[in-house]
Amino acid sequence: MLFLSVGLLAAFPHAAAATTDRNASFTATIVEVPPAGFDLASQPWSQAQPIADFENITTQSPATKNPTTARIVFDRNNVYVAIHAAQTGIPIVRTQSTNNVGFGLDDYVGIGLDTTGNGQTYYFETTPGGVRYQQSAETVKFSPLWNATANVTGGDWDAMLVIPLAILRTQNAPIQTWRFNLVRHIASLNENQTWAYDRLMNDYVPNFSDVRYWPSLAGVKVASRANRPKPRAEIFGLESIGLDRDRYQQATGGFARQGTRHVGLDANVPITSTISFVGALAPDFSNVEIDQQTISPQEFRRGLSEYRPFFSQGADFFIPVGNFAVNGPPNSIFYSPSIGPFDRGTKLEGSFGAQSFGLLNVAGAGFNDSVLGYQHVTSDRGFGYSLQAVSAHHADGNLTAFPAAIDDVTYNFSASNSNRTTGFGEALNYGSERGSVTNTTPRLAYKSENLVSLIKPNYQIFLTYRDVGPKWNPIDGFTSLADIRGPGALVGFSTIPGGASVIKKAGLFFFGDRLLDRSGATHQSDFFMNADVTFKNLIHLNFGPSTSALRLYDGGTSLVGYDGGYRNGVTVPFNSDSVSLGYKDGTPTPYDASLSWGPFETFDGNGSPRSTYVRQYSLSTSRPVGSKFTASAEIDGTLEAFPTTMMTRSAYDGQTLRRFSLGEAFGNESNLSLSLRSINGRGGFGSPGINVSASYHQRFTNAGELFINYGTPAANSTIQRVVVKYVLRFGSGSGT
């Protein structure tokens, strides 16, 4: 399905009366004696201003049926948050028992803190069982030591969060002004509440772009010793045994022989309260290989998620403001999954005032690449501009997605503006590339991607114009399709009927584009219509047609025809009608099914296109089993029909993916997971095979961690490998 995603621009919920918005201001309550219980009427909670009148952002209505109240106080060392959640008549869900596992499956309450006004945003949440979760805008590896307790009484529950100031990156001042918000999730209804509210806020947590709508909190006192996080060092020791003990995942996604790294180091040294030096020496990634396998045929290159600590920390500093994407991940000059195993990396990153930046160097077998990212973003996130640059130097046989000998330098400038009052917004992106590949010059290797938008509570309009040169292909970047030029448009409508209607919310979306190559032929054209309806009984229905035509060259073997003079061009379809049905999505026990069908081009063994009719289906579910176990199951199928030499007969091919996982909690800081995946048949996108993997994780009170992994879920078939890894951590917690 085609889609368009936009950075720095909000979604479009139904209008409702505002409660607390960004114009509100509050003063921090400083106490000498820390609170000891949940009673909001007791000292010192009673000194703080009560926080109430939450908004149900899912239904865009005041949260009066399940009210939430809270208070916040500070002392010299910590932020204390007490929250009372009334939930009479609705089941309180507390199925999880291990910290940072299963976020969103249980009820939770939490706080969001923007400590600098420039991207240093944090969320801290806890469930009725006292299970903790936390997120940082800077890194997915944010996992410091902090505390939370909870208590259930009848149909209500209470929580207290204790957050050390030392784990937060704050301003370099003794008295500071932050922005903050309180949030709540009711799992059995799949509904979210927020205290700070604007009609353009998004209905999910964590959402770091919504910080622009939060009120301010003045008078936050931060002692000088808490201004700067402590230096952090992580030293790991690792042993790998088994027949495949030296097989590890590469930039291509496949596995190859590579020497095991038995010892490695990651370090983070704060230079100021918001700027740090990050270093990695002989890093190991065996415990972050994840299952991203699919059997669905693809029209374009598929983007992968990055989980390696060195790249994931501070990743947002290298992303252009106003970045947007059509039909896949955005065109980027730096796409870290294209970098394979590396030997060392250094990085300087952080923020000051309205500026943020990152400077990175990574080197490994046959490559040495440097990346610069700079952003200027106003505190309300309404305006920003950014500059990115990548200098890549690759030798033959290097461990990246481009193993050839190539030198490449790429620049990208972008700017974005959005007016919350009028709803108008603009985004401009321009990049140029110069490299050792023939004709890789700014005249032919460039991209210009621009957008104008109008966002209102019940509708949105996006108009795009994209011009990507035929030689644009940054070797450390991600490019869906080059040699395109033309307009596109997306129009969406939404409604939240309320009242006695059986519909909770609904949306209708239309998208189309027509993009030419330099010969004047249509290189790509798309149209889709999509309807999305969520009912109050938790049934979710999504359906619509999608049509796409793509011109290929050299008899269908090349995506870009410039070098070959656009000879032997052929236009092929990638069409599908689809329908998906979900029940209890967003709750601990979801059921989901989808079906799609249509003429969708595939390729034979020689890489030539063949006319194919593709049918696909998917079924999945997950659920808690008792108080310790969580299970999930999925089955996907692909059936391809294509002509044979006999005009009246078709040949068939297919593929089936089955996936099952079981997790067991051993306490707040340890868990075991088992995974089984099988792919059979060759009529699909995946490679056949059976994969069995298992992992055990234990976190200790000294913040050290133990990992024991058998195999890996990232492989097509079972990797006969057992990895035992211990991480010894000094200083502050992971990701701080």
Q: Which role fits each region the language model picked out?
A:
Residues 11, 15-18:
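Boundary at the C-terminal end of the N-terminal hydrophobic targeting segment
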Residues 18-371:
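Structural preference for beta-rich elements and adjacent junctions enriched in aromatics
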Residues 77-79, 120-122, 157, 174-178, ...:
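Outer-envelope beta-barrel architecture signal
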Residues 161, 179, 256-257, 285-473, ...:
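Catalytic-domain carbohydrate-binding cleft regions of carbohydrate-active enzymes
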Residues 205-226, 365-404, 543-588, 593, ...:
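Outer-membrane beta-barrel transmembrane domain signature of Gram-negative proteins
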Residues 226-278, 367-433, 497-500, 505-509, ...:
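Surface-exposed extracellular loop regions of Gram-negative outer-membrane beta-barrel proteins
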Residues 341, 425-736:
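Exposed, low-structure sequence patches enriched in small/polar residues
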